[in-house]
Design a protein with these regions (language model features):
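N-terminus-biased targeting/localization segments
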Residues: 1, 7-10, 20-22, 30-32
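Repeated polar recognition positions within modular binding domains
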Residues: 6, 23-25, 63
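Conserved N-terminal structural module of periplasmic/extracytoplasmic solute-binding proteins
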Residues: 10, 48-52, 58-63, 72, ...
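Extracytoplasmic/lumenal domain signature
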Residues: 30-36, 70-73
Length: 245
């Protein structure tokens, strides 16, 4: 049974069951035909997020990613490259809103593969693989815009992706079409320097990128805020790079 009287996230599985986040008590998998409990994941633990990709369940709790086989309920033991990649991005594992999802999963093009999307783009991963492949660069489109939040996404039979987003005060659906003839990164690069992280500059870069898709906008930030670099240090590095051409 569900311990709490409310939930902040639930989703259907390919098996026809329903996954419900039970606040403070993990995830409950329910048979909707009779309301019975199929199994429980991470019992007694606060889970911040759930997502499915085919027969796989993914959860985030305490900034760590966990994967499970929905057929057996057992943990996935061959996703180390995936967990390392996702956990390295604080925006993917720190949830600060319920109006959108910083991270979402999707069934892959093979039984043992999956796609996931975040603010940096769309990625493909094959279970057991040592690398995570980026197939859409978020810096070249609206995915990287600070005012864009993903709420849903899917893929059609031709392999095209459709992403529903909260974009400021609007709801938009973006489509991304893969073309083998389109370079992954434009040949022309424009570097924009910002002493500190700035959302206005990021939004401006996204708008420029959309208007001029043949130019890659590279934003460099002098001070990340995560280290002891001062503004003087950052400007010295910038001047050195400018003098070096």
């Amino acid at each position: 049974s569900i311990q709490s009287s409310y939930t902040f996230q639930a989703c259907f599985t390919e098996n026809g069951t329903v996954l419900i986040v039970d606040p403070g008590n993990g995830v409950a998998e329910i048979n909707p035909s009779d309301g019975s409990l199929v199994r429980r994941y991470e019992e007694g633990i606060r889970v911040d997020f759930i997502g499915t990709a085919g027969k796989m369940l993914f959860t985030i709790q305490d900034q760590t990613l966990h994967g499970y086989d929905l057929d057996t309920g057992k943990p996935l033991d061959n996703i180390s490259a995936l967990t390392e990649q996702i956990q390295s991005d604080e925006q993917d594992v720190n949830w600060t809103t319920t109006s959108s999802f910083p991270l979402m999963f999707l069934k892959g093009d093979e039984d043992n593969s999956l796609f996931y999307i975040d603010h940096t783009g769309v990625y493909r991963y094959v279970l057991g693989g040592s690398t995570v492949e980026q197939i859409i660069d978020g810096s070249l489109n609206s995915l990287s815009s600070p005012d864009t939040g993903t709420v849903a996404w899917g893929q059609d039979s031709d392999g095209n992706f459709y992403v529903g987003c909260n974009a400021g005060e609007d709801i938009k659906i973006y489509s991304y079409v893969y073309s083998k003839d389109t370079p992954t990164t434009p040949d022309t690069e424009l570097t924009v320097y910002s002493l500190k992280d700035n959302d206005f500059i990021k939004q401006a870069a996204v708008l420029f990128q959309k208007k001029y898709p043949d130019v890659y906008v590279n934003i460099e930030t002098g001070m990340s805020g995560d280290d002891s670099v001062t503004d003087t240090d950052a400007l010295k590095v910038l001047n050195t790079e400018i003098m070096a051409g």
